[in-house]
Amino acid sequence: MVILFDRFNLPEDIFEVIFATKQQIIVAKLLIEMVKSNGGEINKTEMSLFATKLHEGNYVTTLIDEAPYKGKKVKISYNKRQFYDRILTPMKSMGLIDYDLYKKTYRISDNFNKEMIRIGLQWLREMRKPAKS
């Protein structure tokens, strides 16, 4: 996933930096909240149930902060395949969520922060290289 941002107009919400659409932002926030409410770790079955509830439009939440929905119970619908392709897989590849192959669990991770530091260090090295000509 490619993240393009304007450092002068950086949103306060990390999800707005990472995800392209409001719907993706909402679903990603709901996923993180669900994992946090389960002690920071969920199993494959719980993830599948979350994706299925979203797919069927049966996921009810009050966590949306947008103007017309704030504080109200809202049913959320999101395609299951797109959830895995556009939300979960990018979150895993960027290091926001880790999957433990042995325990078969998903957990919130700080690897994203570590990778951002590494990217910053790569830029410093590139900046300090002498010109090739």
Pin down the residues of each PLM region.
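Short amphipathic alpha-helical interaction segments
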Residues: 74-94
